[in-house]
């Protein structure tokens, strides 16, 4: 105890001496080149004058003294954050982000690549007016006074504990929360086998609700431990969680004293709380955590798992426990962190405790008298209650937390798996199983799709929305009939946001995918030929070309006319893009007439070869066609037979479109539509006309767009997206002409 007090007194005495020296000398003798741990915590003072009075000046850490209007500009705060905390959070978390970037994206390895050489020469030639020695001393003092506060925070024990927590969690995330025997080792072994699907990722990933639980817990613990330095430490958290654009109002939600998470069954709620509690105990000295659940049997495996993790990571000599009630973790300083367990049948063990974090697992199913004990902790300013639960909205007793949605209380924040905006969409659309805000992804812990939803409904009506999702009941009056399938926000985004594929072609994939849905009719009020040309941009799909072609008359040259239209669209796309595409992969639907499909493919091949020889544009040398075998033969022909893939293709396209992953190029080519209207608006009208038709007691689903309009371009685009994602390259081959 005496040694600890002496150390604190010595530290404070040193800080006073440093402050006195800076005040006396104006920090003029400070080391101008010192950098700590790769960060600019000791960034030198730059003597440049600004033509504003002192009352309108502000100190930007690691930058200098600027006009106070700069304090509200995001660019300066972002630069400050990166310069102060780059070595703490960026090393691990940027590594994760680099691994997650698709290979088609260009990787910038040189920091100077962001500036052109001419801009750098101009910047280096700028000479700033400087203050004289007297004014400079005053500005130095103001600057280093601010920087000293950051140094004081960086050297504090609480901040070091926070950085240790971030570092350890990043290592766990890289290793998918397994195979980490010693968290403080610099080498982290990868998992040899991942039980859950990894979706081609080299590291572990978090569901969005798991990241939010982590953010809520970390922000609140930071505000409690760091006290006056909490606001400065939030800059570090914005770097660590990759949320640079979060405002102070948004981050205030993470410091609220009560947060409710309503998440579907089997999504990894308790699975995530175990390493989170273990890491918090082993990183923050003296932290007190409470954990309660609805029954004793649910607490026992959590108790054992947390204890096993701590013993495996740090050794059994630092872990002590009272069977089923308390786990204690000892630090070299002599301080201890504890976690206390209690079921809703006996909450006496948590009464009178002084928790910093109180996790209430399966909160919707705990006893009412236990809720009263838990709510009593709201009166403790240093305690945050985190309710995590699934919801059975069919009963009032198991969905009382759901009634808290929409609360404007400053103490309470409610997070649901499906937001209010998209709840109606999930309720109406029988194949939707997740919120569009969650990018309609399939969670790692349980694959939820339309088949699972329909199976649950067969056992018990409304069981999917009530028990698995929680928070909605299917209205049987609207189960029959038509319903729209594309969200308004996705339609608006498709109309407004159109990236240019001509100005910057490097990030895009080298291959183009074409789907042709031929129609042999001269009636413009009936179906026409739909053509869609798409490419890939990472996980997104970009529409390069769109055609809706109607024959002038039914003649023997109809197939050649359709093939010429497709070739014209392709050559114009190649002409406006300076970089040559790799392979053009074409699928021509042959359901209506297989002979005509072969003739269309032949005409396209002939036209593309002629364009290639004429060198009118950087035409790809490889034009391949999807081939199918004819019945009873081994001969393959260049056409695509659309059979049962249509519903699957539409389901996939709907998920991608509502997730914002289908985009239209700003330089979209159309020789048939653009003469009369904007091709994107033309396509959008057909998209809004598509509806899902549900019939019969089993709610059989079909898609229709013929009512009041055409759907040819939508079908072509849907199938183009489908073949680009699901058809292997070996199914395409060139044809000889």
Swiss-Prot record:
HAMAP family: HSV_TRM3. It comes from Gallid herpesvirus 2 (strain Chicken/Md5/ATCC VR-987) (GaHV-2). Gene3D superfamilies: 3.30.420.320, P-loop containing nucleotide triphosphate hydrolases (3.40.50.300). GO terms for cellular component: host cell nucleus. It comes from the Viruses. The active site is at residues 362, 517, 589, 712. Its EC number is 3.1.-.-. GO terms for molecular function: DNA binding; hydrolase activity. The keyword DNA-binding applies. Belongs to the herpesviridae TRM3 protein family. Its main location: host cell. Component of the molecular motor that translocates viral genomic DNA in empty capsid during DNA packaging. Forms a tripartite terminase complex together with TRM1 and TRM2 in the host cytoplasm. Once the complex reaches the host nucleus, it interacts with the capsid portal vertex. This portal forms a ring in which genomic DNA is translocated into the capsid. TRM3 carries an RNase H-like nuclease activity that plays an important role for the cleavage of concatemeric viral DNA into unit length genomes. Keywords: DNA-binding, Host nucleus, Hydrolase, Viral genome packaging, Viral release from host cell. The keyword Hydrolase applies. The gene is TRM3. This is Tripartite terminase subunit 3. Signal peptide: none annotated. One of its GO terms (biological process) is chromosome organization.
């Amino acid at each position: 105890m005496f040694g600890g007090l002496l150390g604190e007194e010595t530290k404070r005495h040193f800080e006073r001496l440093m402050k006195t020296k800076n005040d006396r000398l104006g920090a003029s003798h400070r080391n101008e080149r010192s950098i700590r741990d790769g960060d600019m915590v000791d960034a030198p003072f730059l003597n440049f004058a600004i033509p504003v009075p002192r009352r309108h000046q502000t100190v930007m850490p690691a930058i200098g003294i600027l006009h106070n209007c700069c304090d509200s500009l995001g660019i300066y705060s972002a630069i400050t954050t990166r310069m102060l905390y780059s070595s703490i959070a960026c090393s691990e978390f940027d590594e994760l982000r680099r691994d997650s970037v698709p290979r088609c994206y260009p990787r910038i390895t040189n920091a100077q690549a962001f500036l052109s050489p001419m801009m750098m020469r101009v910047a280096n030639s700028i000479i700033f007016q400087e203050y004289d020695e007297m004014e400079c001393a005053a500005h130095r003092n103001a600057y280093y006074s601010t920087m000293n506060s950051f140094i004081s925070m960086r050297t504090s024990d609480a901040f070091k504990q926070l950085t240790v927590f971030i570092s350890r969690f990043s290592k766990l995330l890289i290793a998918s929360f397994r195979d980490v025997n010693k968290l403080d080792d610099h080498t982290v072994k990868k998992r040899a086998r991942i039980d859950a699907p990894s979706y081609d990722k080299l590291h572990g990933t978090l569901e969005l609700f798991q990241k939010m639980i982590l953010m809520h817990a970390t922000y609140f613990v930071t505000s409690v431990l760091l006290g006056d330095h909490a606001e400065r430490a939030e800059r570090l958290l914005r770097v660590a969680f990759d949320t640079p654009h979060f405002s102070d109002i948004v981050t205030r939600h993470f410091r609220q004293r009560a947060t409710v998470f309503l998440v579907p069954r089997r999504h990894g709620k308790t699975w995530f709380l175990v390493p989170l509690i273990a890491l918090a105990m082993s990183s923050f000295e003296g932290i007190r955590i409470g954990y309660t659940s609805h029954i004793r049997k649910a607490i026992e495996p959590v108790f054992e798992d947390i204890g096993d993790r701590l013993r495996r990571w740090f050794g059994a000599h630092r872990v002590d426990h009272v069977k089923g009630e308390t786990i204690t973790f000892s630090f070299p300083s002599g301080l201890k962190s504890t976690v206390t367990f209690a079921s809703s049948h006996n909450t006496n063990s948590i009464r009178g405790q002084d928790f910093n974090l109180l996790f209430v697992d399966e909160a919707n199913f705990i006893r009412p008298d236990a809720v009263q004990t838990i709510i009593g902790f709201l009166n403790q300013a240093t305690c945050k209650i985190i309710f995590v639960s699934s919801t059975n909205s069919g009963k009032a007793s198991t969905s009382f937390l759901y009634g808290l949605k929409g609360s404007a209380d400053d103490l309470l924040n409610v997070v649901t798996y499906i937001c209010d905006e998209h709840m109606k969409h999930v309720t109406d659309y029988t194949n939707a199983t997740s919120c569009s805000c969650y990018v309609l992804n399939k969670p790692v812990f349980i694959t939820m799709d339309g088949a699972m939803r329909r199976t649950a409904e067969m056992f018990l009506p409304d069981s999917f929305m009530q028990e698995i999702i929680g928070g909605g009941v299917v209205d049987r009056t609207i189960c029959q009939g038509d319903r729209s399938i594309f969200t308004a926000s996705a339609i608006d985004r498709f109309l407004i946001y159109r990236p240019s594929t001509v100005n910057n072609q490097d990030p895009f994939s080298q291959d183009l995918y074409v789907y042709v849905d031929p129609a042999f009719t001269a009636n413009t009020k009936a179906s026409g030929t739909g053509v869609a040309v798409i490419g890939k941009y990472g996980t997104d799909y970009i529409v390069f070309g769109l055609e809706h072609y109607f024959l002038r008359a039914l003649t023997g040259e109809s197939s050649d006319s359709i093939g010429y239209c497709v070739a014209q669209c392709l050559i114009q796309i190649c002409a406006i893009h300076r970089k040559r595409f790799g392979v053009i992969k074409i699928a021509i639907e042959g359901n209506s007439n297989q002979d005509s499909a072969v003739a269309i493919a032949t005409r396209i091949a002939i036209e593309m070869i002629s364009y290639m020889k004429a060198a009118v544009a950087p035409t790809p040398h490889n034009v391949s066609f999807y081939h199918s075998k004819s019945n009873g033969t081994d001969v393959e022909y260049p056409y695509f037979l659309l059979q049962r893939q249509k519903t699957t293709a539409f389901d996939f396209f709907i998920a991608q479109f509502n997730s914002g992953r289908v985009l239209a190029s700003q330089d979209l080519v159309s020789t048939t539509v653009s003469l009369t209207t904007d091709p994107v608006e033309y396509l959008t009208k057909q998209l809004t006309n598509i509806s899902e038709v549900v019939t019969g007691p089993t709610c059989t689903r079909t898609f229709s767009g013929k009512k009041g309009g055409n759907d040819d371009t939508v079908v072509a685009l849907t199938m183009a997206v489908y073949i680009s994602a699901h058809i292997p390259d070996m199914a395409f081959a060139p044809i000889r002409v």
